């Protein structure tokens, strides 16, 4: 289903982002995790978020208004090895400043590649979000690239690792940008949160 999705603008500092009262959902993940493809699949708008075979394409905070009811924030990926250290530090600071200070931020969706065991950089992001009291959910991408058995194996690994530090696990979604699997569940979840906020 094609949604009414419009690009607002790109920003290199959260303080430059417009003050918006609508609930905002941030999407973040390692470079090349399939974030842009998922955003396009989620909204049904093919080129809403620019995709690239080269990691590190997203370098700014990109805001979109969705159905005129909520805001989608496409954040720079982390773990891009070819970026200079100064660039990685700059992106990291920009993203963390946004996540800590954006007043209408409702939930962070942390995207992880379903083909990989828990990675240090992903776990560091999760720990940072939790320690700063920022609500987040996990989105496992590219489940179409492997068997259900392998996906479940990776999911079990994540559950085990997270259970070692947290009693309550974050909500998890299994998605495929190719087939669209998981996008309906994700949109339903966002809609439920929006209704709770409205009430």
Curated annotation (Swiss-Prot):
GO molecular function term, any single one: metal ion binding
Coiled coil feature spans: none
Example GO BP: division septum assembly
Binding site for GTP: 29-36, 56-60, 74-77, 141-144, 175-177
Ranges of residues in domain EngB-type G: 21-196
Sites where the protein binds Mg(2+): 36, 58
Cofactor field: Mg(2+)
InterPro entries: G_ENGB_dom, GTP-bd, GTP-bd_ribosome_bio_YsxC, P-loop_NTPase
Record-linked Pfam families: MMR_HSR1
Protein family (similarity comment): Belongs to the TRAFAC class TrmE-Era-EngA-EngB-Septin-like GTPase superfamily. EngB GTPase family.
Name of the protein described by the UniProt record: Probable GTP-binding protein EngB
Organism: Cytophaga hutchinsonii (strain ATCC 33406 / DSM 1761 / CIP 103989 / NBRC 15051 / NCIMB 9469 / D465)
Lineage per the UniProt record: Bacteria, Pseudomonadati, Bacteroidota, Cytophagia, Cytophagales
């Amino acid at each position: 289903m094609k949604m009414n999705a419009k690009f607002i603008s790109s920003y290199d500092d959260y303080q430059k982002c417009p003050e918006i009262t609508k609930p905002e959902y941030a999407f973040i993940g390692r470079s090349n995790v399939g974030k842009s493809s998922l955003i396009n699949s989620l909204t049904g708008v093919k080129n809403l978020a620019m995709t690239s075979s080269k990691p590190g394409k997203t370098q700014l905070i990109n805001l979109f208004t969705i159905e005129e009811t909520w805001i989608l924030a496409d954040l720079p990926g982390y773990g891009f090895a070819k970026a200079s250290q100064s660039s990685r530090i700059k992106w990291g600071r920009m993203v963390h400043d946004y996540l800590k200070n954006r007043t209408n931020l409702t939930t962070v969706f942390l995207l992880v590649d379903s083909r990989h065991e828990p990675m240090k950089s992903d776990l560091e992001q999760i720990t940072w979000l939790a320690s700063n009291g920022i609500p987040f959910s996990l989105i496992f991408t590219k489940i179409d690239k492997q068997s259900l058995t392998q996906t479940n194996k990776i999911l079990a690994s994540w559950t085990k690792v997270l259970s070692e530090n947290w009693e309550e696990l974050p909500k998890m979604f299994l998605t495929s940008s190719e087939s669209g699997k998981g996008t309906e569940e994700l949109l339903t979840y966002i809609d439920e949160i929006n209704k709770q906020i409205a009430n």
